[in-house]
Amino acid sequence: FESVSEVFEADIPYIFRSILDNKIKLYENFNPKILAFDIETTSDGNFPDPLIDEIVSISYYSKNLEKVTIIRDFKKEHDYIKSVASEKELLKDFQETINKFEPDIITGYNSDRFDMWFIKERASKNEIKLKLKPFDEDMIYTQGARNDKPVKIKGITHLDTYIFIRNVLAPRLKTNSLSLDNVAEEMLGQKKLELGVLPHEAWLDDSDENMNKFSEYNLLDSKLTYLLAEKILPIALQFSRFTGLPLFDVTRMRYGRLVEQFIIKSAIEQDRVIENRPSNDKIIKRRATQAEGAFVYQPTPGVYKNIRVF
């Protein structure tokens, strides 16, 4: 239109805009059913490749659920262990477990980059289209930051506990490693079960004793993930309320994005117009333009009275 010189706020996602325009208050009186899961795979010691390696067990943990489904039969010491004959049956059981439990939130530790992605790829390899409730639809990939490949399930919030800890809580942690073992030890006072060898090496020993221990190891990973998710959820929910963004999105943002979203939300609530995100050309020009820094007065060392702080 000739009468329109410029369009503002065109790049604000529709869902976010709708939440703010309709003054929707997110997650009030929210008491979600959380389901944590963890997978174990075969590999040659390198990072598992879904084109080659298989999923051999999946564990699930929640307040009222402890379960390990494994593709090997043996004398079981625990009622929570279920044996299936193949990976295809394992993946079908994954679908059945989620649909029966009907979680509000499903969580894994590094599930964006590993568990969810691996399950989706192996389901495709086995020619299985997962139908997950409440909409009986398959998982879908979304665009994420860096190399992350967030997986969405319609009607269920996928919370990657590791991603949120990495993006938000890591600077406050003493540990230099964000492995599940180290983070759980610092935040929960609990550690993973020691197998003595790497999981894919432990899988080679099919004795009853070892397979029971392998199942315990797999289940504990899910339990630790569940407990961590419970611990971080109140913080994540507050960020959702501050920014007006759904939990799936807000838990995958770093502080810079969170602050930006809070400013956008505040501006819209104050009926202020928000400029569009700058183009690449504008960003290059801004970086090329240098501004003189402010004068910083260096005080003489000593003891002073009547100090004013701005």
Q: Can you annotate each of these PLM segments?
A:
Residues 11-20, 26-43, 139-145, 269-288:
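Extended, Lys/Arg-enriched charged tracts that mediate electrostatic binding to polyanionic substrates
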Residues 13-105, 120, 296-301:
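Conserved RNase H-like, two-metal-ion catalytic cores of nucleic-acid enzymes
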Residues 29-31, 54, 100-106, 152-154, ...:
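Short, well-ordered loop/turn elements at secondary-structure boundaries
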Residues 43-45, 113-116, 166, 235-236, ...:
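Flexible loop/turn segments at secondary-structure boundaries
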Residues 67-70, 76-85, 102, 116, ...:
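Active-site-proximal helix-loop-helix substrate-binding element of RNase H-like nuclease domains
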Residues 103-111, 241:
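Short glycine-rich phosphate-binding loop at a beta-alpha junction
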Residues 201-310:
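Common nucleic-acid-contacting/processivity interface regions adjacent to the catalytic cores
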